[in-house]
């Protein structure tokens, strides 16, 4: 079976030859438990946890912005596209969320763990929507900002760590929902001994 610990902070991780001890706090109550194996899949918090386990994982937060546009009238609903769009020049992507919502996302910002929403980052998303879909009412947009866990090479950290029993499934950047399920299955197979996860070969660069 499985047990979910909601609203729990991981305070300390310690690797031992016979397993990993995890000290965590829930509602002010601290407990320490031992596990045979540990998978780090903590998004932008993965770097801190990895350092406790003897690994250097260079995952950093890259802030992205989105607006969710309520499609509250017939004109907006009929004008917003149902297929996802990618504007490569503007670096903007869209997703239709059912009948009544339209999401527009883009930008990348290096600003530590700050999640404040800047008006100058939101405005280009609103302007882009108004220019391309003038019939969509953008007066009630809901802005949002989130932190993408990114590696410098844009590749996720998947597979075993330096020490036995330590595994990683993190750093998927803006493709977390797209990739993390498949890489989780790969890590599970590796933990069972059914698969060896190896690094992707580096591309060869040639100049003429």
Predicted feature locations:
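Short beta-strands and strand-loop turn motifs
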Residues: 7, 105-107, 169
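Hydrophobic/aromatic beta-strand patches that form the interior of the parallel beta-sheet core
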Residues: 5, 39, 167-169
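A conserved beta-strand/loop element that lines the FAD pocket in flavoprotein oxidoreductases
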Residues: 1-11
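Active-site substrate-recognition segment that forms the wall
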Residues: 12-19, 24, 32-33, 37-162
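Beta-strand segments within the central parallel beta-sheet cores of soluble alpha/beta enzyme folds
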Residues: 7, 140-142, 200-204
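C-terminal lid/capping helical subdomain adjacent to the catalytic/cofactor pocket in oxidative enzymes
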Residues: 71, 155-208
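FAD-binding core/adjacent interface of flavoenzyme oxidoreductases
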Residues: 28
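Generic secondary-structure signature for well-ordered alpha-helical cores
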Residues: 2, 131-135, 192-196
């Amino acid at each position: 079976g499985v047990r979910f610990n909601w609203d729990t902070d991981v305070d300390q991780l310690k690797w031992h030859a016979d397993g990993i001890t995890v000290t965590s706090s829930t509602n002010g109550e601290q407990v320490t438990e031992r596990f045979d194996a540990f998978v780090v899949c903590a998004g932008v918090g993965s770097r801190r946890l990895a350092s406790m386990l003897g690994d250097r994982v260079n995952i950093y937060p890259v802030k992205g912005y989105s607006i969710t546009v309520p499609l509250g009238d017939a004109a907006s609903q009929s004008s917003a596209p149902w297929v996802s769009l990618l504007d490569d020049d503007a670096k903007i992507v869209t997703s239709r969320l059912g009948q009544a919502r339209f999401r527009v996302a883009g930008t990348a910002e290096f600003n530590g763990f700050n999640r404040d929403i800047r008006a100058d980052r939101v405005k280009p998303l609103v302007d882009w929507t108004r220019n391309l879909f003038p019939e969509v009412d953008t007066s009630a947009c809901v802005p949002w900002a989130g932190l993408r866990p990114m590696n410098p090479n844009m590749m996720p950290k998947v597979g075993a760590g330096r020490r036995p029993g330590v595994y990683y499934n993190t750093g998927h950047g803006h493709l977390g929902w797209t990739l993390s399920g498949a890489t989780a299955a790969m890590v599970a197979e590796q933990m069972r001994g059914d698969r060896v996860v190896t690094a992707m070969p580096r591309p060869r660069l040639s100049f003429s």
